[in-house]
Regions:
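N-terminal signal peptide c-region/cleavage motif recognized by signal peptidases
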Residues: 16-18
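N-terminal cleavable signal peptides for secretion/export
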Residues: 20-59, 102-119, 226-232
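Short, surface-exposed coil-to-beta transition loops
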Residues: 44, 66-68, 125-133, 162-168
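An acidic-aromatic
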Residues: 51-109
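Short, flexible beta-strand-to-coil junctions
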Residues: 61-67, 120-121, 174, 182-188
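Extended soluble regions of mature proteins
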Residues: 143-231
Length: 232
């Protein structure tokens, strides 16, 4: 499971004017390690900060509209905190969990079940129950990755199902983190959306495009949710 859902807005980017990209700089005391150009017209900046616990790492997501979200995971890829910069709401992991997500368990056994809570700074508590399974290996832009299948259900504190997500993702053993893939999500109203956040290019320091905040892929496509059962 992607450890921090991007929560990105749907974008219609037809006819947009290209903007000259500047190299993004992480906060003071932090080091930008990799820029990842993704499908769905998004680009991710992966960085680490000296003040954090060993193994913690951050990601900042950009669309054509700018910085939209940022998140921190730990060495086990647990959701430590996530901020939607459009709404301004931050969610944090409740450290008391029935079954924390564990990257080491997934890589050792091939599967990992999880059942944990997050709480927002507005007081909303959400329960997340799901599973990750390894399904094979793949190489994208020279980066060796394990492919995964995941399922995730998110419930309100009262026990109502709010959203169900199923799909495929990728995990890097070297980098210790997940990358998005193709997924289907259905909310409590029955509305279904299909998205593809798969990585396309992994860009390291010194390479062209490192730190760029301008997405390169799928930006001339109309990104819309498809109703269940198909339809125009």
């Amino acid at each position: 499971m992607r450890r921090m859902g991007q929560g990105l807005c749907l974008i219609i980017a037809l006819g947009t004017t290209p903007v000259l990209a500047a190299e993004w700089k992480p906060p003071q005391g932090c080091r930008l390690e990799m820029t990842v150009q993704q499908r769905s017209c998004t680009v991710a900046q992966h960085y680490r900060c000296q003040a954090d616990a060993p193994g913690d790492q951050w990601v900042a997501y950009f669309t054509q509209e700018g910085l939209v979200s940022q998140a921190r995971i730990d060495a086990e890829t647990r959701w430590m905190e996530s901020t939607d910069l459009v709404s301004g709401i931050t969610d944090r992991l409740d450290l008391e969990a029935r079954d924390h997500a564990s990257l080491s368990t997934l890589l050792k056994t091939g599967s990992d079940d999880f059942d944990f809570w997050t709480q927002s700074d507005t007081g909303e508590r959400l329960r997340h129950i799901g599973r990750d399974d390894l399904t094979g290996t793949v190489e994208i832009d020279g980066e060796p990755l394990d492919s995964t299948r995941f399922s995730l259900r998110t419930f309100s504190e009262a026990g109502d199902l709010l959203i169900e997500r199923n799909g495929t993702q990728f995990v890097s053993r070297d980098l210790g983190r997940f990358f998005g893939g193709v997924e289907t999500s259905t909310d409590w109203t029955g509305e279904t959306q299909e998205t593809d956040d798969s990585p396309v290019r992994f860009i390291r320091p010194g390479e062209p495009g490192f730190g760029s905040t301008t997405p390169d892929y799928d930006c001339n496509m109309q990104m819309v949710g498809m109703p269940a059962g198909g339809g125009a």
